[in-house]
Regions:
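Surface-exposed amphipathic alpha-helical segments
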Residues: 1-30, 135-173
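Charge-rich, low-complexity N-terminal segments
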Residues: 2-69
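Surface-exposed beta-strand edges and their flanking turn/coil or helix-capping segments
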Residues: 4-7, 70, 112-117, 133, ...
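Acidic-enriched, low-complexity/disordered segments with a strong bias for Aspartate over Glutamate
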Residues: 17-18, 34, 60, 71-73, ...
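Generic signature of intrinsically disordered, low-complexity segments enriched in small/polar residues
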Residues: 33, 44, 50, 67, ...
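Signature of long, low-cysteine stretches enriched in small and polar/charged residues
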Residues: 49-129
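Short, well-ordered strand-loop elements centered on a beta-strand within folded domains, enriched
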Residues: 129-135
């Protein structure tokens, strides 16, 4: 284990924050590491902005393929008090993506809220060595303090803006 860790640490290289990783490198904040040194991995990064929108990116390099997003049970995706806003496939920059957007009403807790969840998956089948990408966006509206909350229309526009920037390069996202 120590030798593995030292190999990974020796493979770390500096990188500007807005610079794409080179070759088969996995990006980390202000750095990159050779993905082949990691063996089998699953990586995720979450970001929350000042409006409390959480964006999460996930990828992995293992061969396990789970239930495709659009084949998942609606009761699981929507939960008991939820509804689907959109479920389907579309093309973005030549990539076929699967998406499921939903909204849940939580009126039964001490802090009633509306929770939005947007999910996107690319290369679910992992065919041809393509790397899986999962992207999600979550947002909650506290109904007791909803004065400056984003509207559903604004959230959809933001999601479409974000997903419209996705481009695939065979060795990197």
């Amino acid at each position: 284990k120590k030798a593995q860790l030292l190999a990974i640490l020796s493979g770390l290289q500096p990188r500007k924050d807005n610079q794409r990783p080179s070759e088969n490198k996995l990006a980390i904040q202000y750095g990159q590491v050779d993905a082949s040194l990691l063996g089998q991995y699953e990586a995720s990064v979450s970001y929350q902005n000042s409006k409390e929108i959480t964006i999460t990116l996930k990828t992995d390099n293992h061969s396990y393929i789970g239930t495709p997003l659009l084949d998942k049970d609606a009761r699981v995706m929507e939960t008991e008090r939820g509804e689907t806003l959109y479920k389907g496939k579309r093309k973005v920059n030549g990539l076929e993506i699967s998406e499921w957007w939903n909204k849940q009403h939580d009126n039964y807790s001490s802090e009633p809220a509306i929770n939005y969840n947007f999910e996107l998956v690319i290369h679910e089948d992992k065919k041809g060595g393509n790397k899986l990408l999962e992207l999600s966006m979550d947002y909650s509206i506290d109904l007791l303090h909803a004065d400056n909350a984003l509207t559903e229309h604004e959230l959809v526009a933001l999601w479409e803006n974000i997903t419209g920037t996705i481009k695939y390069h065979p060795t990197q996202w």
